[in-house]
Design a protein with these regions (language model features):
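FIC/Doc superfamily catalytic core
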Residues: 1-110
Length: 110
């Protein structure tokens, strides 16, 4: 049985999700700090697949790590990284069973 190819996030998609998330949370300090840092993080799952034997959770983990480590947004970096990781998993048919509030709380370091 063949598996579906992984759908990777685009730069434009991440920007839209970041802005929508920050507005929904009532944040006023958000936006792009460095586009190259976003694109670098978005490339990590592709590299993990090309140069290793990364399954979907491993690709998601490297995406999340890259987004948090790179700190590419003005604000909301951990929340956006957690949200985008969840989105990445969902668009590829994998759902996290934790409540969204628990995911955000865990992802924001609280």
């Amino acid at each position: 049985m063949a598996t579906e190819p992984t759908r990777y996030l685009t730069y434009a998609e991440t920007v839209v999700h970041h802005i929508e998330l920050m507005r929904a949370l009532g944040e006023v300090r958000f936006g792009i700090f460095d586009r190259a840092l976003i694109e670098s993080a978005l490339a990590r799952p592709k590299h993990a697949a090309a140069y290793g034997d990364a399954d979907l959770p491993a690709k998601a983990a490297t995406l999340c790590y890259g987004l948090i480590k790179n700190h590419p947004w003005v604000g909301g970096n951990k929340r956006t990284a957690t949200h985008l990781t969840d989105h990445f998993l969902r668009i590829n048919g994998f759902e996290i069973s934790a409540a969204p509030a628990a995911i955000v709380e865990n992802g924001s370091g609280h």
